[in-house]
């Protein structure tokens, strides 16, 4: 294709609203354009990239045995009310009414719709297992859409849903989809990691997330350097520390005027933060609960929700703290609270000896408290965020490291979460009704495009992996409008490369060479070939791989061999 025949509206300046590199470069390169907050138009160049992602995803879904269908984006409210998610999903669910005053929503996901389809159409165990998928537009009414395609309100997603007679059948499909996802992201040329994950609002049992590794990623990815353990921060655990063994000191209440934070407490008392048991007051499903952590640890609200079996866990407000304990925040502790409040401690907090904690009165703290002697041990659970250097929970030798990642895929074992609430039953081999078990599997197709840019760029622009590039080869024809020889040679090379199976963009624009080179670098085509009177006079082509800054002169045989070699690298 000729550059003069395709619309590529590049920008010299970075738009002010673009924060992430992917947002900046996709706008500057003419791949997308903003319509409204969180809404983007895919321009011709961007759509070529998007279609490449879709093609790879579709091929691997078909290879795994999943069957493609297409469901409505507008969904009736009664399905969501039936599953219990109409209220649970919150304001991110865009709700609307039709002219008959019936309630609907724009689908952020399709568990309810596919469940309704299954209960209408699947009646016998002979029809199972079955796995359906679609590639379709979704909508989530994000409160603050930002980062371009990374967190928009409208996005394109591949979502798949499988139905089974039992868990062993689900496990087989789950593994097949897990492996299909690995193939998808490998084929797309992305560096990624699959990690154990929490199921969140989707519900269900086992799940894994797939993260593209990038410094700009919103998510913390925890992994062991010695074994294959990996999890996201919400799920990650560490091997418990051994309890401290010290001679108990005399407990004492001391004045700590105005000392509210752990750091202030440690400095005032002359102790490390690890010698403090801090109290975090939360409201779990409307009930006040006291959570205890070691002073140098951070509360993981997702873990707390699971430990408390609560759907909603919020930090207590100052007035709630005083009402429940008689003390302001910063001075609350587990010893003799004003009211009988449920207490749950993190495992590490129960391993601290001679610790300091709030005394449930303003400007007072305890020091040298010890479990069992001064106060009873409360129930314990894993409540903390792991930290780099923690011991791996799966092996004896490993320690944990933390990297940043961008979530681009998620696979869930839903179990009976939706089949029970929506009554999906089939006749089993004995002729009795049996509840099916489900899995669901998502890939953020449009998000993959942005994530790829976050991983593949330099100060000149995007560096697309071959599998994602809108064109694989860019030919820069210098002064083609003035030199018939350059125009003819560039066109002949274009035709030869396309005959070899490459997708080629021939830059035949009447622009200065510097502008042509800058455009090629910005849009990130993997291979650049320069055709000019100078190189033609030498009987060679000037070649550069986008990932390098090295220009090399090659004859046609060498050029074809170099392209094949570089192309194979991705």
Curated annotation (Swiss-Prot):
GO CC terms: cytosol
Species in which this protein is naturally found: Acidithiobacillus ferrooxidans (strain ATCC 23270 / DSM 14882 / CIP 104768 / NCIMB 8455)
SUPFAM superfamilies, sorted: Class II aaRS ABD-related, Class II aaRS and biotin synthetases, YbaK/ProRS associated domain
Gene3D superfamilies: Anticodon-binding domain (3.40.50.800), Bira Bifunctional Protein, Domain 2 (3.30.930.10), YbaK/aminoacyl-tRNA synthetase-associated domain (3.90.960.10)
Cited function: Catalyzes the attachment of proline to tRNA(Pro) in a two-step reaction: proline is first activated by ATP to form Pro-AMP and then transferred to the acceptor end of tRNA(Pro). As ProRS can inadvertently accommodate and process non-cognate amino acids such as alanine and cysteine, to avoid such errors it has two additional distinct editing activities against alanine. One activity is designated as 'pretransfer' editing and involves the tRNA(Pro)-independent hydrolysis of activated Ala-AMP.
UniProt-recorded name of the protein: Proline--tRNA ligase
High-level lineage: Bacteria, Pseudomonadati, Pseudomonadota, Acidithiobacillia, Acidithiobacillales
Any Pfam family matching the protein: tRNA_edit
Subcellular location field: Cytoplasm
Gene this protein is translated from: proS
Top EC group: ligase
Entry's family note: Belongs to the class-II aminoacyl-tRNA synthetase family. ProS type 1 subfamily.
Its EC number(s): 6.1.1.15
Recorded catalytic activity of this chain's protein: tRNA(Pro) + L-proline + ATP = L-prolyl-tRNA(Pro) + AMP + diphosphate
Assembly, per entry: Homodimer.
NCBIfam families reported in the protein's UniProt record: PRK09194.1, proS_fam_II
Highest taxon in the source lineage: Bacteria
């Amino acid at each position: 294709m000729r550059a003069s025949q395709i619309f590529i509206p590049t920008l010299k300046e970075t738009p002010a609203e673009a924060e992430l590199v992917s947002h900046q470069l996709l706008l500057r390169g003419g791949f997308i354009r903003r319509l409204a907050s969180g809404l983007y138009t895919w321009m011709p160049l961007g759509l070529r990239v998007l279609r490449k992602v879709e093609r790879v995803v579709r091929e691997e879904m078909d290879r795994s045995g999943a069957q493609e269908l297409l469901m409505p984006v507008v969904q009736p409210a009664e399905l969501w009310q039936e599953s219990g998610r109409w209220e649970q999903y919150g304001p991110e669910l865009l709700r609307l009414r039709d002219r008959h005053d019936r309630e609907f929503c724009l689908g952020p996901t399709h568990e309810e719709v596919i469940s309704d389809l299954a209960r209408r159409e699947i009646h016998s165990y002979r029809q199972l297992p079955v796995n359906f998928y679609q590639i379709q537009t979704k909508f989530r009414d994000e409160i603050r859409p930002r980062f371009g395609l990374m967190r928009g309100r409208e996005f394109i997603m591949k979502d798949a849903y499988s139905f089974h007679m039992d868990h062993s059948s689900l496990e087989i499909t789950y593994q097949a989809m897990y492996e299909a996802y690995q193939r998808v992201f490998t084929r797309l040329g992305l560096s990624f990691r699959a990690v154990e994950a929490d199921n969140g609002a989707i519900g269900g049992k086992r799940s894994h997330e797939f993260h593209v590794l990038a410094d700009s990623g919103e998510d913390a990815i925890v992994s062991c350097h010695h074994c294959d353990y990996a999890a996201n921060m919400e799920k990650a655990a560490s091997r418990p520390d051994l309890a401290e063994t010290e001679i108990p000191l005399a407990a004492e209440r001391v004045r700590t005027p105005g000392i509210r934070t752990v750091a202030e407490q440690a400095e005032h008392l002359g102790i490390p933060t690890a010698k403090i048991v801090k109290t975090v007051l939360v409201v779990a499903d409307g009930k006040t609960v006291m959570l205890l952590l070691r002073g140098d640890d951070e509360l993981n609200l997702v873990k707390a929700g699971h430990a408390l079996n609560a759907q909603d866990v919020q930090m207590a407000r100052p007035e709630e703290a005083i009402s429940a304990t008689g003390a302001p925040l910063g001075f609350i502790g587990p010893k003799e609270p004003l009211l009988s409040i449920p207490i749950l401690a993190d495992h590490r907090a129960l391993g601290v000896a001679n610790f300091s904690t709030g005394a449930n009165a303003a400007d007072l703290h305890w020091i040298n408290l010890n479990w069992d002697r001064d106060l009873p041990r409360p129930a314990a659970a894993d409540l903390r965020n792991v930290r780099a250097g923690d011991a791996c929970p799966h092996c004896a030798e490993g320690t944990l490291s933390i990297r940043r990642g961008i979530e681009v895929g998620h696979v869930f074992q839903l179990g009976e979460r939706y089949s029970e609430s929506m009554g999906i039953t089939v006749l089993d081999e004995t002729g009795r009704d049996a509840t099916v078990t489900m899995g669901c599997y998502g890939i953020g197709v449009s998000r993959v495009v942005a994530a790829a840019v976050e991983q593949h760029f330099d100060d000149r622009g995007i560096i697309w992996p071959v599998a994602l590039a809108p064109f694989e080869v860019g030919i820069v024809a210098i002064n083609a409008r003035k030199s018939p020889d350059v125009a003819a040679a560039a066109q002949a090379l274009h035709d030869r490369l396309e005959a070899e199976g490459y997708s080629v963009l021939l830059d035949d624009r009447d622009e200065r060479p510097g502008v042509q080179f800058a455009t090629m670098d910005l849009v990130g085509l993997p291979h650049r070939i320069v055709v000019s009177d100078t190189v033609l006079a030498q009987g060679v082509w000037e070649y550069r791989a986008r990932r390098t800054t090295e220009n090399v002169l090659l004859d046609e045989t060498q050029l074809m061999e170099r392209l094949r070699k570089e192309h194979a690298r991705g």
